[in-house]
């Protein structure tokens, strides 16, 4: 999982009436996890981020999507992309920002790639929250330990200081067609 493109979009844009971060997420392949793995991931996330269960976004309740009937059948990548976006919003919220909505959509003709829209007050914090979200979910999927408290402390410091965060720096604001 990685971000392959990012842009800061100005106040009035196609996706939001407020500034937002447009990121293209590449999951690596179209169906990264089975239904059982996604259920385990949601359970583990609920333990480390209890506010995530109450979180809603423009797309509905976290993970609110039809899953395959067979327990080991692959899920569509959209479910994982939505979860990454929802975790990023929750992490962003934990810095004191009131961001509560976002958008996730598939990139046409590019299986495994998703457009994530994260409204923000501070673009650097949105970028760092998304980077932390991907790292957390990647670690949980690999069953590796992850120091979320250290990540949150760094995220809060970025929010307090306005210093550049981890991850690639998005391009300057520019109109995006499509």
For each predicted feature, which ranges?
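Preference for protein termini
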Residues: 1-178
